[in-house]
C-alpha cells in the first residue's frame, strides 16, 4: 500500500496539527514537494518546519522504515538530501550515508481512504467510481477533461515521434503511414501500417501521375496480386506490378494479415487501398496541403477522395456490383481527422514552434462531433456526456490510461471518491 501512502502525503489527507516525528519534533508541512516518477527520492523540494526550523529537501516514503536499508538508501548519496522519512510502520531508526539520522514520522492511512481505495480496486462495476460521477463538482469535471485532452495530445505526439524516427524524419512519409493505419479503422490498422512501411515512397513518386501504376504498386505490396487467375483489370494490374516489382526490387507483405470477418464491403481492404491510391495520386505534398488548410471542411475536401472507375462496380477483384461512388463517409472522414490530421497539426506545431497549428488542432476537435463508440456510450450512461471530439478523446484517454490500468490514485474522479467519508 506504499502507493496509497504517497497519495495520502501528496494530498495532505492526514491531521496536520498532530504531526510529530518519532523523537517528538513538531512537524509543520508547508509544501509536500513535487512527486518524482524517476529514480531517486519520492518527492522533491518539499518544505516543512521541524520545531519551527525551516527545512527544504526531499521526502522518501516506505511501508516500513526498515525498507530504507532494504533498498540500500543508507549507502546511496543520492538520498542524503532526504529531510523526512515517512512510513506507516516505524521499526528502526534510519540514517544518511554519512551516518546522520533522518527524522521520521509514522503516517497512518485514514481508514475511510483505505476502504474507498479497496472498493475501487475490487468492485466488479465499470468504472468503479460510477456512483459519484453525477455529483462531481462542475469545475472538477471540466478541468479534468481539459487536462485529459492535453495528455492525449502529448501521448499521440510521442507515438508520432517514434514513427517519425522510423521514417528518417520525413514528415510526409510519416503522415501517409499514419493515415494508412487509420484507414484500417481498428480491425485492419496493424495490417495497413505494415503495408505502408512496404511502400517505396521515392520510387512510387516517380509514377505518381499514373493512377493505374500507383494501384499496381499499392495492391501488389499488399500481397493481393499473388493469384494467377482473375478478371481483365486484375491481370493488367498484376502484369504492371510484376514489371515494377522487378524494377524496384519490391517485396509484398503477407496477404493473410488482412482481415475481412465482420467487415461491411465498403470497409474491405481493397476499397481502402483503392481510396488511398487515388488520394496519393491526386494530392501531392498531402501533409503540406493539410497544414495550409485553415478550415475543417477544407481538410474534409482534401481527404474525401474516391477511386478509379473499376472500383465503382467492385468491392474486391472479380464479381461486380451495382455502380456507386466509393467515397469516405463523413463519420470516417471525421475519425481520420481526429486520429491523423489533428495529431499532426499538434505535433508539427510543437516541432516548428508554431502555436497557430497547435491551436488549430484544438479548435478542430472542438468543432468535430463527439465520437460514438462503446467508450463514449459507457461514460454517457454514468453522466459524462461528450459534447465534441475533444471531450470524447478525453474520455477515451480516461478509460485507457486510468480505468483500465487501475490508476485511480492519479485520477481526479478517483480523488473525489477516496476523500468520501
Show where each model-derived region lies:
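N-terminal "leader" segments that precede or initiate the main folded domain
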Residues: 1-6
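N-terminal ordered "arm"
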Residues: 7-66
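Short, structured segments at the rim of ligand-binding sites
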Residues: 39, 76, 411
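A broadly used, surface-exposed interaction patch
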Residues: 42, 46-93, 98
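Short loop/turn segments at secondary-structure transitions that flank enzyme active sites
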Residues: 65-67, 89-92, 111-113, 185, ...
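Compact, glycine/acidic-enriched structural inserts
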Residues: 80-82, 86-143
Amino acid at each position: 500500500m506504499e502507493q496509497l501512502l504517497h497519495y495520502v502525503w501528496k494530498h495532505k489527507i492526514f491531521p496536520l496539527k498532530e504531526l510529530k516525528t518519532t523523537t517528538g519534533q513538531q512537524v509543520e508541512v508547508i509544501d509536500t514537494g513535487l512527486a518524482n516518477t524517476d529514480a531517486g527520492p519520492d518527492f522533491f523540494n518539499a518544505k516543512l518546519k521541524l520545531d519551527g526550523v525551516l527545512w527544504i529537501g526531499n521526502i522518501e516514503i516506505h511501508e516500513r522504515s526498515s525498507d530504507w536499508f532494504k533498498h540500500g538508501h543508507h549507502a546511496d548519496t543520492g538520498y542524503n538530501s532526504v529531510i523526512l522519512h515517512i512510513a506507516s510502520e516505524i521499526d528502526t531508526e534510519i540514517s544518511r550515508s554519512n551516518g546522520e539520522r533522518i527524522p521520521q514520522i509514522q503516517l497512518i492511512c485514514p481508514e475511510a481512504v483505505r476502504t474507498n481505495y479497496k472498493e475501487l480496486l475490487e468492485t466488479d462495476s465499470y468504472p468503479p467510481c460510477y456512483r459519484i460521477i453525477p455529483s462531481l463538482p462542475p469545475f472538477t469535471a471540466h478541468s479534468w477533461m481539459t487536462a485529459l485532452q492535453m495528455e492525449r495530445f502529448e501521448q499521440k505526439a510521442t507515438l508520432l515521434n517514434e514513427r517519425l524516427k522510423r521514417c528518417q524524419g520525413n514528415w510526409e512519409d510519416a503522415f501517409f503511414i499514419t493515415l494508412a493505419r487509420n484507414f484500417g479503422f481498428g480491425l485492419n490498422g496493424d495490417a495497413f501500417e505494415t503495408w505502408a512501411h512496404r511502400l517505396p515512397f521515392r520510387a512510387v513518386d516517380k509514377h505518381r501521375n499514373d493512377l493505374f501504376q500507383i494501384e499496381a504498386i499499392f495492391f501488389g505490396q499488399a500481397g493481393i496480386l499473388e493469384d494467377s487467375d482473375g478478371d481483365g483489370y486484375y491481370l493488367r494490374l498484376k502484369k504492371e506490378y510484376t514489371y515494377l516489382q522487378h524494377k524496384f526490387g519490391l517485396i509484398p507483405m503477407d496477404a493473410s494479415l488482412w482481415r475481412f470477418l465482420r467487415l461491411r464491403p465498403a470497409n474491405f481492404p481493397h476499397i481502402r487501398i483503392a481510396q488511398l491510391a487515388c488520394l496519393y495520386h491526386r494530392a501531392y505534398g498531402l501533409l503540406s496541403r493539410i497544414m495550409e488548410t485553415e478550415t475543417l471542411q477544407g481538410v474534409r475536401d482534401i481527404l474525401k477522395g474516391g477511386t478509379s472507375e473499376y472500383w465503382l462496380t467492385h468491392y474486391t477483384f472479380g464479381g461486380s456490383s451495382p455502380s456507386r461512388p466509393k467515397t469516405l463517409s463523413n463519420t470516417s472522414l471525421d475519425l481520420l481527422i481526429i486520429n491523423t490530421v489533428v495529431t499532426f497539426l499538434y505535433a508539427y506545431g510543437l516541432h516548428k514552434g508554431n502555436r497557430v497549428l497547435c491551436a488549430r488542432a484544438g479548435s478542430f476537435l472542438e468543432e468535430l462531433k463527439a465520437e460514438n463508440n462503446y467508450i463514449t456510450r459507457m461514460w454517457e450512461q454514468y453522466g459524462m456526456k461528450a459534447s465534441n471530439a475533444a471531450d470524447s478523446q478525453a474520455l477515451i484517454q480516461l478509460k485507457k490510461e486510468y480505468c483500465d490500468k487501475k490508476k485511480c490514485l492519479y485520477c481526479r474522479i478517483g480523488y473525489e471518491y477516496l476523500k468520501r467519508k
